[in-house]
Amino acid sequence: MTQFDDHPLWQSSLNPADAPAVQSLSPVALAYLGDAVFELYVRCCYLFPPRRIGDFHRRVVAQVRAEQQAQILTTLLPQLTDPEKEWVRRGRNAATSTSRRANPELYQAASGLETLLGYLYLRDARRLDELLALIELPDAAPR
């Protein structure tokens, strides 16, 4: 478990009856949410010990870039269930545009990770915590 257990951030307001609504969301919409969830998680991990805002920002940006997210996905893949891998696949296939500096394959992998994180945020906060706890962030506060 992470230091953020029982924090409202990870407590989705959706109940099991909302499952069809979540299933109907596009992978792009889930990736949009997953991007925000992941960045907020990384920001929380680097919040302590206190740092200058520029150092804080550099550390966070280094972790939320497509290249790093693709590497994180590679690390997590062996731990994913088949349904989770399906969300990653859907996210990869839905990635439509890339930044000029990003390799398209890396961008697709990052989109797959973000899609999965967005889905888990809405449907399974405990599993989201489990997967986030597996991510090693350099120089982050102990979790």
Swiss-Prot record:
One of its GO terms (cellular component) is cytoplasm. The active site is at 35. GO terms for molecular function: ribonuclease III activity; rRNA binding. Its EC number is 3.1.26.-. Keywords: Cytoplasm, Endonuclease, Hydrolase, Magnesium, Nuclease, Ribosome biogenesis, RNA-binding, rRNA processing, rRNA-binding. Pfam families: Ribonuclease_3 (PF00636). The keyword Transport does not apply. One of its GO terms (biological process) is rRNA processing. It is found in: Cytoplasm. Its cofactor is Mg(2+). Involved in correct processing of both the 5' and 3' ends of 23S rRNA precursor. Processes 30S rRNA precursor transcript even in absence of ribonuclease 3 (Rnc); Rnc processes 30S rRNA into smaller rRNA precursors. Homodimer. HAMAP family: RNase_Mini_III. Belongs to the MrnC RNase family. This is Mini-ribonuclease 3. It comes from Synechocystis sp. (strain ATCC 27184 / PCC 6803 / Kazusa). The lineage of its organism: Bacteria, Bacillati, Cyanobacteriota, Cyanophyceae, Synechococcales.
